[in-house]
Amino acid sequence: MPAPTCFSCHKTRAALRRPRSGQALCGSCFCAAFEAEVLHTVLAGHLLPPGAVVAVGASGGKDSTVLAHVLRELAPRLGITLHLVAVDEGIGGYRDAALEAVRSQAARWELPLTIVAYEDLFGGWTMDAVARSTAGSGRSRSCCTFCGVLRRRALEEGARLVGATHIVTGHNADDMAETVLMNFLRGDAGRLARGGVLGSTGEGCALPRCRPLQFASQKEVVLYAHFRHLRYFSEECVYAPEAFRGHARDLLKLLEAARPSAVLDLVHSAERLALAPAAKPPPPGTCSRCGALASHKLCQACALLDGLNRGLPRLAIGKGRRVLQVEPPQPGNPSLVTSDPVAPAGPCTCKQPKDKANPCGNGGDRAGATCVSQCDLSPGNGEDRAGATCVSQRDLSLGNGGDRAGATCVSQCDLSPVAE
């Protein structure tokens, strides 16, 4: 049976049938329709006003490559200026090749490119160093948890560096649907409320962010790259298999097989989601350390870096460890963290006996935990794992060993198990 004629131009043989509409289109007409839909998304959502300086998050992958190409085609009509911003996470054997793809794209399309590195922004930390630090620590957070938070912060810093007024990322409809599923499964009402919004800021980000490909399926993104002959980096990150997103992706595939419109249905549902007043998160404040938008005392980036710089996992009980010193941000210093050794704790002033039969109960510590200094653990910092260590006055909301949000240590305290 011969291929049908293109539904749009009625001249050329159709090369595909669009999953969304069922229309048979040739490659040229499909690309034109794809670009028109992205233009409609931007204009209808008032995402990029004329005169905007747009930082395009460029990873070298298919989504950011297609986004940069489409916006370059639409830039004269939108009246915007584009600047590619790439993030070097410090993943050996993976990121170097991806950055080469980004450099090639920037040269081919004559777009300015700025690369910002975790190592420069975050006190020497790279993702490989984070992976080594957290390996075997018993933490529930995957490398992708750290990378997602730090990458958003790095992209924000890169955008500020180039004088951007807006940030765009290449999240497609499948990415958005996976995020909606993840937030439902986690019961994260705050992120559910933000998840379907085309333009938003989010924690740690003051510049407006938007996702022009939010309604474009992953299949159509790949098809656009194919028909436009776009070259991109297609290898998966070495840390991706451990991410929780993979479970949401598998579930989404099952849903899509039973209901082809499931992806867009989830995206539109998130857009229309209305939370009860009691479930709505409070308006964001500012991070006490770096000044970024934050829903707690510390923004997510500073809190994660705080935990990393405390030296977990510890090599042995009682060994020295590096910790984060709580200092106000210094003008002109691009690093978010500084590390220094902490002085040993003072003599124990805890009034309760410290032995296995009658362990220290200051704050509800586990049997066997020994308090070696006065410490107020009233919000629940008594569920610490063996080896969790509070080292100075700070908010432990991110959980040094599983602490609840709001737990604040007011003095040095070692919660290691009692030695034999």
UniProtKB/Swiss-Prot annotation:
Alphabetized Pfam families for the sequence: ATP_bind_3, zn-ribbon_14
Family, per entry: Belongs to the TtcA family. CTU1/NCS6/ATPBD3 subfamily.
E.C. number(s) listed in UniProt: 2.7.7.-
Top-tier EC class: transferase
Predominant cellular place of this UniProt entry's protein: cytoplasm
Primary role: Plays a central role in 2-thiolation of mcm(5)S(2)U at tRNA wobble positions of tRNA(Lys), tRNA(Glu) and tRNA(Gln). Directly binds tRNAs and probably acts by catalyzing adenylation of tRNAs, an intermediate required for 2-thiolation. It is unclear whether it acts as a sulfurtransferase that transfers sulfur from thiocarboxylated URM1 onto the uridine of tRNAs at wobble position.
Listed GO CC annotations: cytosol; mitochondrion
Database matches in PANTHER family: ATPASES OF THE PP SUPERFAMILY-RELATED, CYTOPLASMIC TRNA 2-THIOLATION PROTEIN 1
Single Gene Ontology MF annotation: nucleotidyltransferase activity
Phosphoserine: residues carrying this PTM: 200
Stated name of the protein: Cytoplasmic tRNA 2-thiolation protein 1
InterPro entries in the record: CTU1-like_ATP-bd (IPR056369), CTU1_C (IPR032442), Ncs6/Tuc1/Ctu1 (IPR000541), Rossmann-like_a/b/a_fold (IPR014729), TilS/TtcA_N (IPR011063)
Pathway: tRNA modification; 5-methoxycarbonylmethyl-2-thiouridine-tRNA biosynthesis
Quaternary structure note: Component of a complex at least composed of URM1, CTU2/NCS2 and CTU1/ATPBD3. May form a heterodimer with CTU2/NCS2.
The keyword Ribonucleoprotein appears for this protein: no
GO biological-process terms attached to the record: protein urmylation; tRNA thio-modification; tRNA wobble uridine modification
Gene: Ctu1
Subcellular location: Cytoplasm
Assigned keywords, A-Z: Cytoplasm, Phosphoprotein, RNA-binding, Transferase, tRNA processing, tRNA-binding
